[in-house]
Amino acid sequence: LSKDLAKFDRIGAATLEQAGLVTKLGLALLFLLVVWVGVTIVSAGGEQRTIVIIAGIIGGYMALNIGANDVANNVGAAVGSRALTMVGALVIASIFEAAGAIVAGGDVVGTISKGIIAPEDFPNSDMFIWCMLSALLAAALWVNIATMMNAPVSTTHAIVGGVIGAGIAAVGFSGINWPKMGMIAASWVISPLMGGVIAAIFLAFIKANIIYRDDKIAGAKRWVPILVALMAGVFSAYLVMKGLKRVWTPGGWTITAIGVAIFAATYFVVNPLIRRQANGMENRNKSVRTLFTIPLICSAALLSFAHGSNDVANAVGPLAAIV
């Protein structure tokens, strides 16, 4: 009897797993259907309408794959530490990803759409359009395959490689903006190195001033509000410098003053919250981890904004070039 019950349990688990897969596939197809309807409504008539609709659907497919693969980079730490539930993390990611793309994504869209290959280097516009379509589809397929293999890959590498490959096939090596490509490739090396160095510095600082202190709670009370305020101040300076440049171009001192003001305001808001949360806590690392809930949530939100301002262009850039 126990063997039969175990078989039924396995059958039930397999059924639930298949139902989950079908639900996910249905939601993905529904999203692409909504994209198709939306692009059909807003696109103008004429010979290029069909191409625009196809490009919109492929762009939606690419966006799905970016969400499936890259969003984990933004919220994984917050979910893994249980600072956020999966639903809460996805809500935060969706809001801040969209905000980042809208507010600060214009420059990266421009680089993908016309910074690597330029329309004027092609014999006609149709060849440029098909080149971008090919790059977008190739990148989307590769990221989809990598996601199915549970491999975290760079969607930026995928789309840049797709654009270069399609450009070389269409007009040869001379059609590629190699100086720009050199800058992009350099960023691929510099970014992980800088990220690792900065992370190591922060970890060493936290260990020295909080984790390895005799009074861990006192250290957390002092430094956690400062770390949260530092994130807010730096982000505000970035937002003013990058996101508002179309309507306002402030000087360096103005940007610095705004960052310092936001730092101070955030500190005076967060400091009493952390101190109130720390009251009565035991002097253990487990208690310290609880006090890092707010920084983890803030970092997930800000990282999602940064990701939206950069990687969403991987789907929007080729589409903008076509439209």
Label every model-predicted segment.
Residues L1-V323:
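Alpha-helical transmembrane segments and immediately membrane-proximal extracytoplasmic
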